[in-house]
Amino acid sequence: MLVAGVVIETMPGRAPAVARRVSQMKGLTLFGSDGDHQVVAVSRLRGGAKLEGLLEALGALDEAILRVEPTTVSEEDD
């Protein structure tokens, strides 16, 4: 299983709405938001899922998302 922390940068003031959408995605755990323009989450990808696919999916989730950056990436046993 691939475990990746991500920081999602949004347009100013849009982090709360993006955080709500991220919290509904399967395999993602929302860790918090600064309430303005940043959301932090951790993803647990199973079955050969790729980090690039996650980053693309998050980037396409909402037009208010400006950038998605991985912060930490590690492998864990399933």
Could you say what each language-model-derived stretch is?
Residues 1-78:
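Long, contiguous binding/interaction regions
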